[in-house]
Amino acid sequence: MTKKICIAIDGPAAAGKSTVAKIVAKKLRFVYIDTGAMYRAVTYIALKNNIAYEDEKAIAALLQKTVIRFEPGEVQQVFVGSENVTEVIRSIEVTNHVSIVAAHPSIREALQERQQVFATEGGIVMDGRDIGTAVLPNAELKIFLLASVEERAERRYKENMAKGFTGDLDQLKKEIEERDHLDYTRTHSPLKKADDAIEVDTTSMSIDQVANKILSLAELKINN
């Protein structure tokens, strides 16, 4: 039987976390938990209910009454209550405001508690901004992915084009720099590399190369 370890993958926007985490989880037959999708879902419910993104108290009250769940599939499905929000939480509007919502301490605390419940039995791959430092500080394997702003903007641009969104590459660079600033400087659970995390610069690596590197590290932990 495969040892059920927890793998935490952190890093800034568009560093390739989700794509790599899905591959690693599938290969190991682990459960993938997309924490970014949870913050996006909260941002979406604020948008849907006409609540200002800065209104932490109102968003927190709404979150208390909201169930966010995942269902497996070729593309993991994300639900808010009974509504499938898999596509809408990737909209430009949500993408441009999720860092504001994610900076609210009460929102982070509420979602971190839910994320920790997901991980109680191990056998999970979880990606986000603060998994190795705040959500799963005892994870057996912690990875911190990096890539240049230019590379990340290029990746996001290609993603947007594939989804039919138009966009400006220079504008994407600016937005990523702004998200980095918000993520690294927020008071509660800022983005930072855990002391025991392994740093992987993905700038000149393919997705498969990154995934294979993490799988090799995971196998060492599983067989140790």
Curated annotation (Swiss-Prot):
Residues annotated as transmembrane: none
InterPro entries referenced in this protein's UniProt entry, alphabetically: Cytidylate_kin (IPR003136), Cytidylate_kinase_dom (IPR011994), P-loop_NTPase (IPR027417)
E.C. designation(s): 2.7.4.25
Swiss-Prot/TrEMBL keywords: ATP-binding, Cytoplasm, Kinase, Nucleotide-binding, Transferase
Gene Ontology molecular functions: (d)CMP kinase activity; ATP binding; CMP kinase activity; dCMP kinase activity
GO biological process: nucleobase-containing small molecule interconversion; pyrimidine nucleotide metabolic process
Residues where ATP binds: G11, P12, A13, A14, A15, G16, K17, S18, T19
GO cellular component, one term: cytosol
Main location: cytoplasm
Cellular compartments annotated: Cytoplasm
Record field: catalytic activity: CMP + ATP = CDP + ADP; dCMP + ATP = dCDP + ADP
Family as reported in the entry's similarity comment: Belongs to the cytidylate kinase family. Type 1 subfamily.
Record-given protein name: Cytidylate kinase
Name of the coding gene: cmk
